Design a protein with these regions (language model features):
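Conserved motor-coupling elements within RecA-like helicase/translocase cores
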Residues: 270-273, 280-308
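SF2 helicase catalytic motif II
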Residues: 315-316, 330-399
């Protein structure tokens, strides 16, 4: 049974709105204790009426439905909203939730505590610009789980609704396919003697999942990894897929910034349209905060095993550099439980082994983005800094792309003449050798991808809205008939809306050809 079907049942069978909300809150409590992204992070989740310190809030309806306690003894305030899709998000609800989440309370030791994160869970498919504007510049980090994140979660929703919790409601883990097993085996042999290598794999053939298996294999599911991506959207996607697909334990640390809340953007800003609000896990670019998180992750790793993984955007690579430099340069005494006596009965203290902070592997996704020019005497861009092992220390580097970027010899010569250096993916010193390749045509032949299709269609006047026709007629606008036709044609093709004329005209010549391909 799907998430949507569970929602439909709750809507039909709940006695009233309050009962519907209570059912959803209980479902979300079980979800947070079961979904891999949160299950290893949270050691307790309470309904508000179960929260042991609610008396400090006066006991009224504060807009806080759940409270979670993390393994690092931090508290999250959680709001669960079971909205109808047509219902607008109430901005007063958000304001009320944030205001009460800023209040402090005393724990059972008499220590003052505060919430470190606000998690907003709702059933809408979009959040809205007004809501996003409201939660910017808050003192407490704000995260949102919406309909799509919940609907796509690898969870048995029927079992969860029936009261089960934990690993029993997690869907069966997938296993590598034949081409992925080949890539994993080749990587294992390759990294025995080499430090850097490349996967050239067509989109849709499972680069991200293959990389996870390589990382698990090479670290025995017990390493320190850096995964770099060019956007927050890809970071979120990778974070969720790795947490879902791992057969071990992953302790994530997310490094990225939400530049959408800043008017000033640097050349290394995380420049994509995704806000960190929709990143389903806490993220930071504060060096001290990240160092604390990483050290806590290593404590967890020492107890139960697992991989400590930094998920970061390339644009935040300077932050990762500062974090690693600090961890490698600082020697720390380990706690009193590790004080020993020497042979002559002189006490000595065990010193932390900082070498564990050298990455076992750096995985560079969309590696063609790490190519480009390095001009002598100027700062390198964030994307090319990853190649420098003095900048980021790692035992191995894996570069992955579907579209390798290689510069011509002529371009390289011109760069040298201009006191510059080109980072090209045929540079073995920087990128290593090609470990495995599967191109688009081979993937189609193996049945892994759908082939391209040509969609031929025409645009009738009745399909062009009057507003666009007026814009075309207005010589002061930049839109042309040709541009408008292409835009409408693309929309129709992507939504698979075809007129009878378009279907018939597949057999003859047309004014417009729009090339698209099936989703893979």
């Amino acid at each position: 049974m799907s998430f949507q079907q569970i929602l439909d049942i709750y809507r039909k069978k709940s006695w009233n709105e309050r009962n519907k909300g209570e059912r959803f809150e209980m479902l979300m409590k079980r979800f947070l204790l079961s979904y891999p992204l949160y299950a290893n992070e949270l050691k307790e989740v309470w309904l508000w009426n179960e929260f042991p310190y609610r008396k400090d809030f006066g006991g009224n309806d504060l807009g806080i439905d759940l409270v979670a306690l993390t393994v690092n003894d931090e508290y999250w305030s959680i709001q669960c909203k079971f909205y109808d899709e047509k219902t607008n998000i109430n901005l007063d609800d958000i304001s009320h939730f944030i205001a009460n989440s800023n209040r402090k309370f005393l724990d059972n030791k008499g220590q003052s505590q505060k919430f470190s994160l606000c998690l907003w869970i709702d059933t809408k498919k979009s959040f809205g610009k007004n809501a996003e504007q409201l939660i910017k510049h808050q003192h407490i980090e704000f995260k949102r789980l919406g309909y799509y994140e919940l609907d796509n979660a690898s969870i048995d929703w029927q079992a969860l609704a029936d009261g089960e919790t934990g690993k029993s409601v997690q869907l069966k883990k997938k296993t590598p396919r034949e081409h992925q097993r080949k890539a994993i085996a080749l990587a294992h042999e390759y990294f025995k003697t080499k430090e850097r290598g490349k996967f050239i794999m067509a989109c849709g053939t499972g680069k991200t999942y293959t990389a996870l298996n390589v990382v698990e294999q090479e670290t025995n599911k017990n390493g320190f990894i850096l995964f770099l991506v060019p956007s927050i959207a890809l970071l979120s996607q990778t974070l969720k897929s790795w947490l879902n697909d791992t057969t071990g334990i992953i302790y994530p640390v997310c490094i990225c910034s939400d530049t959408s809340s800043s008017k000033v953007k640097s050349k290394n800003s995380d420049s994509d349209d995704t806000s960190t609000i929709d990143l389903p896990f806490p993220a930071t670019t504060n060096v001290d905060t990240a160092i604390y998180q990483i050290k806590q992750r290593f404590i967890q790793q020492s107890k139960t095993g697992g991989m400590v993984i930094i998920f970061s955007t390339y644009q935040s690579i300077d932050v990762v550099h500062k974090i690693q430099q600090h961890l490698l340069s600082n020697t720390n005494e380990i706690n009193d439980n590790n004080i020993f006596q020497s042979a002559n009965n002189t006490p000595f203290v065990k010193i932390e082994d900082n070498s564990k902070y050298i990455f076992d592997m750096i995985v560079c996704d969309e590696a063609h983005r790490t190519t480009g020019i390095k001009i002598k005497g100027t700062d390198d861009s964030a994307f090319v800094k990853v190649h420098d092992n003095k900048f980021l220390q790692a035992k191995h580097r894996l570069y992955m792309t579907a579209t390798p970027r290689i510069y011509t010899e002529e371009a390289k010569k011109k760069a040298c003449q201009g006191y510059a250096e080109l980072c090209s993916m045929d540079d073995i010193e920087k990128y290593g050798e090609e470990i495995y390749r599967i191109g688009f045509s081979e993937a189609v032949e193996k049945g892994l991808l759908s082939d391209y299709k040509v969609v031929v269609l025409t645009i009738g006047e009745d399909q062009i809205p009057a507003s666009i026709q007026n814009a075309i007629a207005d010589k002061g606008t930049e839109i042309s008939t040709d541009s408008a036709s292409k835009l409408i044609g693309c929309i129709n093709a992507l939504s698979k809306r075809m007129t009878l004329d378009s279907l018939n005209l597949r057999l003859c010549h047309n004014k417009w050809l729009i090339l698209t391909r099936n989703s893979v």
